């Protein structure tokens, strides 16, 4: 009689056979196992693992089915940023891209790796010692969301690498997508079941991967292609991009079979034509092709510009287009007051999506196209994502149409719509008095990346603003549980009579009588159900609501108490979050982070003249002027004062960056003022002769010319200084420069930090400060704060609920610091919270 196989051996054999089948199906595209046989093996493995739970493993194929839902995704900071790519839309742009590389590297015909640009969701997969440990979305490039549980359900993604020789840490970047045939089959199944269909494969992939319940993701037909690597440690990879892709394929990752190595611009353009011709017949959606310099040494030599590499570019296909009719042109007011014209369209299918609205960008664009109500227009999904009106079919224009004009008044608040000189965008002048701007400002202020007020949704923000209880974002910190309960009852009631019936159950008789008087005051006939104005809710909310003493025993209050607690929690924040939350035009997360790192103090930032902001890398004139305009407004300064007075606390204030010592000078101020003809060279020349704007005026034209400054430059400078507002700005900028320099630590204190050259890792939750704040303070002392533990880690800071990083640090003999030791160390070196 044959002995039964050992369960551990059988489980191991089943896992290997199933993963081999996955590899042959998804990577090699050479399926060698029938679906029925695959299902039979999977069922046997599931049964064995249930019978022997001690043999369970995270990398088992059975773990792809998904787990219970999470409440939200955790943030993941990418060790290396997931950069975006520059775009090319013409052959000339591609030729120019190749020319720049050829000249820089002195190579006539450089080699490129060319590949399709999949229309899916970019992700990063982290492997340690060959095992999948974490997966994250791209997010903003610096920080993504942990979607590891969902990625485990994607069969094309290996849970353990094949072969050998992988680095200890390997981060693989790629695209999760939904194949066209799988998308159509899924939608057909949903229609048959009466379920919700997906709009298009791209949205299907992105939405599936961001499901909080991984069991839902497991039911979606997702796949994956690898296109590169991120962090790599303790291991070597080939020195060309194409060879790296070949190595990834050998380790078990699917790589597009359409990847080719081509030479020069002719090779790139020929590849573009081949892929474009085959586009409609591909098994997946693409919106262009990507060209990457194949040689890694050349990539390092080319480097990066802003948030994109100089050695790679995306060559986009022309957007898909359809014709339809303009039914109306309306104005939308954004949170910064921008008045954007939007075309309301007769519904039309464009690139798999029903489009009913399309942006017209601005009034100048409407004038160029001469778009009119009633016109037949060409609608294009720019980048296959954002619908826009691309052209007017003039010969189909009906008679009697009229040229469109920008309205003179805001459609929301009635304030004047104005346009600054030289600007394309019109804006509502109502600023914070405009409900449209207030609502958008509140949405932005409480968002996750800003003040992170959990539980305050868009609909309730509208109720808050409409009620008049909050007129500025600082009013959030005055709200009470009773006010929230009152607003919820009004906003959800079907009629004022229903609201009063509900209120009677929860109010003392005197308070109820007061409420009844308010309802009658807005014109509601309480004797019957008639004569109820459609706007009764908004009217009552605006009527100045009394504060009622609700009977907490009879009404559900937990949601309101949780919201108040979330508002209270948001009082403690960081400078970069606070700056981002203000909603300053052109100031995104990266700019807010840079401002925080360079200046370190809200009081300093809010009083700086705009030219000094240009000293921060990647902040140009437009962003600097936007910052200056924002802080010049008395209403905005009052809003900041209100927030601080109502308990908002910025916990990571620190001295300005020592880099400002070299960046700031009289010459730099001259350069940044945007004075006509005063180039950086002329600014240095002027600063060598005088040391202040007052001295410039005193010196006069002759003295400046004798110092070698050309007469046209001197004339332009003195003419600029003749305007009082320019003189005031110049003097303020120089005074602010001196203030900043005076606040810098002494030069001899900046030579080295106590942690220079040391790598530190933080894990767990800290009580006294956030991990971001701890990271900034450690970096200020010279440390490099990493995301993973290795033999090179100097010490690990372990907070509450420290996880696997603590275990790994202990196994490697890495020194462990508790929060108390960290705080003492920071205090000893001037970085106390």
UniProtKB/Swiss-Prot annotation:
GO BP term, pick one: DNA repair
Residues at which NAD(+) binds: 35-39, 84-85, 115, 138, 175, 292, 316
Keywords linked to the UniProt accession: DNA damage, DNA repair, DNA replication, Ligase, Magnesium, Manganese, Metal-binding, NAD, Zinc
Name this polypeptide is given: DNA ligase
Reaction catalysed by this enzyme: NAD(+) + (deoxyribonucleotide)n-3'-hydroxyl + 5'-phospho-(deoxyribonucleotide)m = (deoxyribonucleotide)n+m + AMP + beta-nicotinamide D-nucleotide
Gene name of the record: ligA
Active site per the UniProt annotation: 117 (n6-amp-lysine intermediate)
Broad enzyme group: ligase
The family this protein is said to belong to: Belongs to the NAD-dependent DNA ligase family. LigA subfamily.
Domain BRCT: 750-833
The EC number(s) this enzyme carries: 6.5.1.2
Binding site for Zn(2+): 410, 413, 428, 434
A single GO cellular-component term on record: cytosol
Annotated NCBIfam families: dnlj, PRK07956.1
Cofactor list: Mg(2+); Mn(2+)
UniProt GO molecular function: DNA ligase (NAD+) activity; metal ion binding
The protein's role, per its UniProt record: DNA ligase that catalyzes the formation of phosphodiester linkages between 5'-phosphoryl and 3'-hydroxyl groups in double-stranded DNA using NAD as a coenzyme and as the energy source for the reaction. It is essential for DNA replication and repair of damaged DNA.
